[in-house]
């Protein structure tokens, strides 16, 4: 995994075309589309991407989904980065990489400042990006922050 110190701005939970074009005006780098049926931001129907801003990377968010469904959904929606929030194994991530997708694996950080360094290291060769998020009872982002100092010793 290459370490990139550049800031990337991603807005996630995009569902309707009007909202997508409004966010595009903010000059974001990435837009996220949630394909997890339990999420309130679930995108059940694929968008028509003919008017989509193609200079923005499209991220598909999945949780413990079958690889074939991830592939088909991603291809249908022109997804470039697959973001995984479940218990997907490194081998699962590697298969998606070999299929030509960039892979982002999400890891939960708990309030006790414990960083899952051993677990993260298992994914270094099969993921292009990591997303560190505050632990919640469910999957996905909560909007709550954690103590970023917990990441200071990690050199991935």
Regions found by a protein language model. Name each.
Residues 1-156:
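Conserved N-terminal beta1-alpha1 strand-loop-helix module at the mouth
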